[in-house]
Amino acid sequence: GMICRHPIYLERTVRMIGSDIANTSKGTGVVHIAPAHGMDDFGIGQKHNLSTESSVNSDGEFMANIAPNLEGKFIFTSGNEAVVEMLKEEMNLFHEHDYKHSYPYDWRTKQPIFVHTSNQWFVDTAMLANKAEAAISGITTYPDNGISSMLNRLQLRSYWCISRQRAWGLPIPVFYHKESGELLLNESTIQHLVSLVLKHGADIWWEGTELLPTQYNADEYERGRDILDIWFDSGVSWDCVLRDSKNRTTQADFYIEGKDQYGGWFQSSLLTSVGLQGVAPYKNLMVHGFVLDEKGQKMSKSIGNVVDPMVLTNGGKNPQRDPAYGADALRWWVAESNVHQDVHISTTIIKSAAESVQKIRNSVRFMLGNLNEFDKMKIVPTPAMLILDLRYRFEDKKLWYVTSMNYPLNLSV
């Protein structure tokens, strides 16, 4: 293929690779590849055996392996400025200007995200896909279109990263040799840790000092700092919950969750169960929609569109703005909602529900008013109602003949 010269390190050459992630309808049609810093780039790198060595550390700073003069510079500020200066020095910067473009941001901090590779633990879901598909072929979902959605998500998921770097969580019980980096994880070390956790709790992993069995030299190893993905935690809940009196796992009659769990709890439970016992952990899936705001947006504290049910039922600090509609109005709104679809909620919607409840109350009051002093002992028995009905018809017909002066020879009912 085509070979290009590096714009900064002129002695280096770069191989051109064709891919559909770049096209001529947007930009120049040519983009750089950073296999260690992007999902698409990583996929292309794997396909073409490109290096995935990272050039940015976990603090967002350039590392020495990319260029000594860039080491320690933050990529979004001084690092960018240094790269621009290096391009200028080599006379390879044709134009520079600021412009707006799409870029991923963290939804919590609202700060830009930079992706980089790191060593993680994975489950090869491709090896479980066929077994998982076979296991859910007999599963019933409510609504009935859920299986296809779940199958689509399974087919798109080739690997499942089950490790996370957090300050809390269930640790992955692996040890690393301090010199060689070789990992230590076997039945002996697991059983030893199980006994420690049963005695001291899960925090023993972070606080304990004698975590290895006596046949190992603990001074040569260090504990891992990774924790399990919370979806792996919840995904094996069936192993604790669904055990019978003989300690055998069984299938749950129902798993009930939101529609987003086709790629979450439903899937993680399926994969772990199929991998460990060869069957799905459930017989049926019940899927519900979500409660959205009046405009159909997901409610979020950061956006400020959360509807407080306590304010709707009991009223807010300002009764004129937030009157109390009562619990029955909220119950009515729930009762008339479709469980499988997203539903909207707002003050206006609950006000309408309260009006519906008031109409029902008025109707009930009317009926109760008509039943005032009602005595069930005075109710005419059902068999006697026929005689009364015949008598009424006779009297009605007789009255008509009398008023019309038209008597028949034989008057009967």
UniProtKB/Swiss-Prot annotation:
Keywords per UniProt: Aminoacyl-tRNA synthetase, ATP-binding, Ligase, Mitochondrion, Nucleotide-binding, Protein biosynthesis
Single GO MF descriptor: aminoacyl-tRNA deacylase activity
InterPro entries hit by this protein: aa-tRNA-synth_Ia (IPR002300), Ile-tRNA-ligase (IPR002301), Ile-tRNA_ligase (IPR050081), Rossmann-like_a/b/a_fold (IPR014729), Val/Leu/Ile-tRNA-synth_edit (IPR009008)
UniProt KW ATP-binding keyword: yes
Superkingdom field: Eukaryota
Reactions this protein catalyses: tRNA(Ile) + L-isoleucine + ATP = L-isoleucyl-tRNA(Ile) + AMP + diphosphate
Enzyme class: ligase
Protein name (record): Probable isoleucine--tRNA ligase, mitochondrial
Source species: Ciona intestinalis (Transparent sea squirt)
